[in-house]
């Protein structure tokens, strides 16, 4: 048996075990990390040589879910794992975002961390353990790394914080918060919440940071025993003579180029100055060094103006929002639409409503099987005036869409209140920063324009950060793209007037203090109120009527014991209803039936069929049915779907009838009255009392009158 190094802790009342040396022994570093009965294999491999022609850290983090982990066989034709699920992509981003700032920017060797979920107890989410596992293999490896980090999930249930809540606990939690932090600072925050107040959110982040310390202690213990000697950080210095020459050439001109409020004018001015600079110095210095030095001059100009003058490069104040505009009812025919504009950033959001049958089917390790609310974010290259490949959404688009989706979920009506599947598409048509928060604003308005009865409007804002010497800093409201590029943080907060619904924090520095976190959260609250004021002017309440082009959903309730009658053998009956009426039919286990139709007549037709299928035949009631069979003694009539009664020959007319066929034939419609339901549940009908209401129906025993002729027996001849 292969021996392994094993390290244990008890975290949140469950056992955490990290082992190394048993699996993936050819990787540069590898561990398994198990929390309760959820287990992941985490590996790190690094290229031996730097990659040529790159000016960034080539880090790739792949998060892979194995369906066997939960005892499942993958769906689809080939029955094997294919492209990562949306949840897997988000889990990969959750790991990448906090680790990247802690690795040297100068590192050019390819790094690949693969996180594979190999066991899932369906109670504990694996995503945060991917973060802890990735941090552990980096700490063990020879890669320079300013970690380790701890990652904790925090719930808020009945006024108490819960460390690493289970899926079941999250159902009743007001908060789903993930915090990643080093020993001293927070490096990543991600949260979804049900309008949590700002002070509770800050306390939850502090609670998580304290919980992370035990995970950091554990990784330090592993590193002390198994860690390799770290490689030196590569030195990528710009020659001093280049920096001096560039600074002298652009002195005073960089601030002038950056001062344009219009994004296009600003970019043209910056690029024009760059072209002049390269033309003047390229014969003396390498172009790459010139461009790197110029980039540093731009960064210095942006940051110094903010820190020293409290003014941003385009003249805006530290807390000043860009020009805002909101519009609804933008497009014809669609179910709901809105456009939200913030400076040069524009997001158009379209709402489409469908039946619950159109919910997304999830094939992954998440606790949910279906999803009735989807927000899809698209970022077209024309939004930045560029020519790029346009294709399927990447990780960034999926992440931005998930954030906006998370921000809106707390205000959505329940399926019982609004039995629709809701799809939102947020199309970015102009981008100068903060498109994800623009998507929240436009999507909130689009839902209201579609008549979705959301509880409140939701707005989002990004808060940036500029840090200086001696722990000085400045938080800035509503960052533009250039401030995001050259700043230190993107602190996104979405919420209503009553609290926070989502947070996502990314940073380029190696962590932020709680003073910065508090300033950012309260600064975002002030800005959010101002944005909601503008949104309210466009549309303050959801429309009371749906679009005439949206499907209508009608809800009825049936006896749960009659569900089988509606579905039929192998679904035959319900398929027939859908085909006959051109509707959709969803049935819940409690007997709730939701019928979706494009017109009222189709819905009413489907409702009548379902009600007839589940209705009990009552004595004295009158029905119009169809003749299904004819016997010598009478006719059988289907008076409700699948339910027959018999009209005796003497009850077919108000005169003597010689042959049943003289009055009715198979397929004829006939109105009858239920005159008796005998002790065996058989239904006797009369057409005679319909023709003559004063006629008295005859009660008869049908035991001697079988529904179908019986087989010939010798005794029949002797009785004749």
Curated annotation (Swiss-Prot):
Binding residues annotated for Mg(2+), in chain numbering: 484, 490
Protein's cellular compartments: Cytoplasm
InterPro entries recorded: ExoRNase_PH_dom1 (IPR001247), ExoRNase_PH_dom2 (IPR015847), ExoRNase_PH_dom2_sf (IPR036345), KH_dom (IPR004087), KH_dom_type_1 (IPR004088), KH_dom_type_1_sf (IPR036612), NA-bd_OB-fold (IPR012340), PNPase (IPR012162)
GO cellular component: cytosol
GO BP terms: mRNA catabolic process; RNA processing
Chief location bin: cytoplasm
Co-factor requirement: Mg(2+)
Top-level division of the source organism's lineage: Bacteria
CDD domains per UniProt: KH-I_PNPase, RNase_PH_PNPase_1, RNase_PH_PNPase_2, S1_PNPase
Domain S1 motif: from-to ranges: 620-688
Catalytic activity of the protein: RNA(n+1) + phosphate = RNA(n) + a ribonucleoside 5'-diphosphate
UniProt key word RNA-binding: yes
GO MF annotation terms: 3'-5'-RNA exonuclease activity; magnesium ion binding; polyribonucleotide nucleotidyltransferase activity; RNA binding
Top enzyme class: transferase
KH domain: residues covered: 551-610
Keyword terms of this UniProt record: Cytoplasm, Magnesium, Metal-binding, Nucleotidyltransferase, RNA-binding, Transferase
Annotated stretches, region: Disordered: 697-720
Record family assignment: Belongs to the polyribonucleotide nucleotidyltransferase family.
NCBIfam families the record matches: polynuc_phos, PRK11824.1
Protein name as it appears in the record: Polyribonucleotide nucleotidyltransferase
Organism: Dehalococcoides mccartyi (strain CBDB1)
């Amino acid at each position: 048996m292969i021996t392994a190094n094993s390290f244990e802790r008890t975290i949140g009342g469950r056992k955490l075990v990290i082992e190394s040396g048993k699996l993936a022994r050819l990787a540069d570093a590898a561990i398994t990390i198990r929390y309760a009965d959820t287990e992941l294999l985490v590996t790190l491999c690094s290229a031996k040589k730097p990659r040529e022609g790159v000016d960034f850290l080539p880090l790739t983090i792949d998060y892979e879910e194995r369906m066997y982990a939960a005892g499942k066989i993958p769906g689809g034709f080939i029955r094997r794992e294919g492209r990562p699920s949306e949840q897997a992509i988000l889990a990969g981003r959750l790991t990448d975002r906090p680790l990247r700032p802690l690795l040297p920017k100068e590192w050019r060797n390819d790094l690949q961390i693969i996180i594979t979920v190999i066991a899932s107890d369906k109670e504990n989410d694996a995503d945060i353990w991917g973060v802890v596992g990735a941090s552990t293999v980096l700490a063990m490896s020879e890669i320079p790394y300013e970690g380790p980090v701890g990652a904790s999930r925090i719930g808020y249930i009945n006024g108490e914080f819960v460390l690493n809540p289970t899926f079941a606990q999250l159902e009743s939690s007001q908060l789903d918060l993930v915090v990643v932090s080093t020993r001293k600072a927070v490096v990543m925050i991600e949260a979804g919440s049900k309008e949590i107040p700002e002070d509770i959110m800050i306390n939850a982040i502090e609670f998580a940071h304290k919980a992370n310390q035990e995970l950091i202690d554990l990784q330090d213990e592993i590193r002390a025993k198994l860690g390799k000697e770290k490689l030196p950080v590569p030195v990528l210095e710009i020659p001093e003579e280049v920096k001096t020459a560039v600074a002298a050439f652009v002195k005073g001109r960089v601030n002038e180029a950056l001062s344009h409020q219009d994004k296009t004018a600003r970019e043209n001015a910056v690029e024009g100055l760059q072209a002049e600079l390269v033309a003047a110095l390229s014969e003396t210095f390498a172009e790459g060094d010139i461009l790197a030095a110029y980039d540093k001059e731009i960064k210095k100009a942006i940051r110094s103006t903010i820190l020293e003058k409290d003014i941003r490069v385009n003249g805006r104040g530290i807390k000043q929002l860009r020009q805002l505009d909101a519009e609804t009812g933008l497009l014809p025919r669609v179910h709901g639409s809105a456009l939200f504009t913030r400076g040069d950033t524009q997001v158009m959001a379209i709402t489409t409503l469908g039946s619950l049958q159109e919910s997304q089917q999830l094939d992954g390790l998440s606790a949910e099987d279906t999803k009735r609310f989807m927000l899809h974010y698209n970022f077209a290259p024309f939004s930045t005036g560029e020519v790029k490949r346009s294709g399927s959404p990447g990780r960034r688009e999926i992440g931005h869409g998930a954030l906006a989706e998370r921000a809106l979920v707390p205000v959505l009506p329940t399926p019982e209140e609004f039995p629709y599947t809701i799809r939102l598409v947020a199309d970015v048509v102009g981008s100068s920063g903060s498109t994800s928060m623009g998507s929240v604003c436009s999507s909130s308005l689009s839902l209201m324009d579609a008549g979705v009865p959301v509880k409140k409007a939701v707005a989002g804002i990004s808060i940036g950060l500029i840090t200086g010497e001696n722990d000085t800093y400045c938080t800035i409201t509503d960052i533009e793209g250039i401030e995001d590029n050259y700043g230190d943080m993107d602190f996104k907060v979405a919420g209503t007037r009553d609290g926070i619904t989502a947070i996502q924090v990314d940073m380029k520095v190696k962590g932020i203090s709680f003073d910065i976190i508090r300033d950012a959260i309260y600064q975002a609250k002030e800005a959010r109120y101002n944005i909601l004021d503008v949104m309210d002017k466009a549309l303050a309440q959801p429309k009371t009527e749906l679009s005439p082009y949206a499907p209508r959903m009608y809800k009825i309730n049936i006896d749960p014991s009659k569900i089988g009658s509606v579905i039929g053998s192998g679904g035959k009956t319900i398929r027939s209803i859908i085909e006959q009426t051109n509707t959709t039919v969803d049935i819940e286990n409690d007997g709730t039936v939701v019928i979706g139709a494009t017109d009222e007549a189709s819905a009413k037709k489907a409702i009548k069929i379902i009600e007839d299928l589940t209705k009990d035949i009552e004595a004295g009631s009158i029905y119009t049915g169809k003749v299904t069979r004819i016997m010598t003694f009478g006719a059988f009539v289907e008076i409700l779907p699948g339910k027959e009664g018999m009209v005796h020959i003497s009850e077919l007319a108000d005169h003597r009838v010689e042959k049943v066929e003289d009055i009715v034939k198979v397929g004829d419609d006939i109105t009858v009255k239920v005159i008796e339901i005998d002790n065996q549940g058989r239904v006797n009908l009369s057409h005679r009392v319909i023709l003559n209401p004063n006629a008295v129906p005859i009660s008869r025993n049908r035991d001697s009158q079988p529904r179908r002729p019986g087989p010939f027996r010798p005794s029949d001849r002797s009785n004749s």
